[in-house]
Amino acid sequence: MDIPQKFFRIDPIENVIYIIREISIMERKLFGTNGVRGIANEELTVELALDLGKTIASLREGLIAVGMDTRLSSPMFKSAIIAGILSAGGDVVDVGITPTPSLQYYVKESKANAGVIITASHNPREYNGIKFVNNDGTEFTWEQDAEAERVLMSKLFKKAHWNGVGRVYEDDANRIYIEGVIRKVDVSAIADKEFKVVLDCGNGAATFTSPFILKELNCKTFSINCYPDGRFPARQSEPVEENIWELKEVVKSVKANLGVAHDGDADRATFVDEKGNFVSEDVILALMAKHYVEKNGGGIVVTPVSSSKCVEDVVVEAGGKVIYTAVGSPVVAKVMMETNAVFGGEGNGGLIFPEHLLARDGGMSMAKILELMAIENKPLSELVKDIPKYHMFKTKVECRDKKKLLEGLRSEFENANFTDGARIDFEDGWLLIRPSGTEPIARIFAEAKNEKRAKELLEFGVEKVKKILSGYSEITKFS
């Protein structure tokens, strides 16, 4: 494979490439790894949303699609975004409550020149966010977000004449998205199995798409929390194992073939096997990456440095190549596009199927797992049993000074991999410390074959972050 000059090889293993981060999120004040986020009416205000609407209409002429999740503050922000777009002369197609991938797919398939989704994804209910979408359905890249922030800060917006303000239209993005998902899977193979599926929409936007996808696939669906409620009364929005205990219990009680859980905007999906066991997001990523490499007779898989080594193991063994990027779906999608990758995704349940959409897609992930179960004629527990076993632990530490943390990490770990944050590799595991792009926290990941060792690495990472942020000068030796 020809490696473009911007690719920086730092790993001696053949078929493994790392890409250095091209623009630091630290250079931007408002835009993080997933647009602009903050606590509604405190950090993210109506005034800011209005200006963001003016910003996107100043950057992209013509029709702009606007959608939102189920959060209580989303209608307020949607109104402000639309007002800003109209004032700058842009037209709006209002698609209402819709998952992020549904909005993105709609923009790709329609005449819209851009999109805006109002969502804070998996963040707590008091948060909300605003994210821009290109006309090919991809999220704005870091460079595009930086450009948007410059326009926003300058206040040099377009301003329409009284008879040139935009108009508002409406359309059904969810119907178009559902049809798009169905076209990309083997419907007859899935339908013949008559799978029993327990679906937990988490009171989010998946309520308007995933049940209908399962219906089209002839699945018998047992629904949990599949009604819109921006208070998220049943569980926290993030579909991690500790939040979806009810899903696990229902899968066992009804003897279902599969359990599926979504986050607030349904760009992610996590899974429970037929025994009621949670299947880790990295294992699902590895399973699907292996499938796509085998199906294509090789190819490139793109994933962030935070992903489990099990992904690399199965991809290389199947004859594929792995490209590691910084954390964040926009950069993963961008590199997938540039390298014609066969598959990509993050180890948080966000999988990217390039034949459908270069963006994370929880609904498509659900359909593709069912398809794999059908064509292989195996339950999920059997499909994942040969994926290499690693122990990964994740945690987060409050971090109000991200610049100080990064400077401290560079000082203490000179030989670390700084693709995104600091990844320190040991003979028997690795540790990643990176400031979040959406919250005032530092995320810490540790992985090893041995559970005890993984926990030791995690504890070391937490201790190191706290010492750097407190200004404690002692350097802890660890190997």
Role assignments for model-derived ranges:
Residues 258, 296-479:
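Phosphate-binding and adjacent anionic-ligand microenvironments
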Residues 141, 223-225, 277-296, 329, ...:
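Gly/Ser/Thr-rich active-site loops/lids in small-molecule metabolic enzymes
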Residues 1-25:
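N-terminal amphipathic/basic-hydrophobic helices that include classical n-h-c signal peptides
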Residues 54, 58, 64-128, 213-272:
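N-terminal small/polar loop signature for handling phosphorylated ligands or for N-terminal nucleophile
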Residues 26, 39, 128-254:
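Gly/Ser/Thr-enriched, mixed-charge loops and adjacent short helices
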